[in-house]
Amino acid sequence: GSVLNCGETCLLGTCYTTGCTCNKYRVCTKD
């Protein structure tokens, strides 16, 4: 949607928050 920081990092490339994905900065965001 808009880029929303999920307050989660994803050093292993996995986001545990529903709907969140790992971006190239290793931060989980929601579309």
Curated annotation (Swiss-Prot):
InterPro entries with a match to the protein in the record: Cyclotide (IPR005535), Cyclotide_sf (IPR036146)
Cyclopeptide (Gly-Asp) cross-link, chain position(s): 1-31
GO biological process per UniProt? defense response
A Pfam family annotated for this chain is Cyclotide
Q: In what way is this protein post-translationally modified? A: This is a cyclic peptide.
Q: Which UniProt keywords apply?
A: Disulfide bond, Knottin, Plant defense
The cross-references to SUPFAM superfamilies, in alphabetical order and at most eight, read: Cyclotides
What cystine pairs are annotated?
Answer: 6-20, 10-22, 15-28
Give the protein's function.
Answer: Probably participates in a plant defense mechanism. Inhibits the cytopathic effects of the human immunodeficiency virus. Has no hemolytic activity.
- What note about domains is in the entry? The presence of a 'disulfide through disulfide knot' structurally defines this protein as a knottin.
**What does the sequence similarity comment in the record state about its family?**
Belongs to the cyclotide family. Bracelet subfamily.
Protein name as annotated: Kalata-B8
Species whose genome carries this gene: Oldenlandia affinis
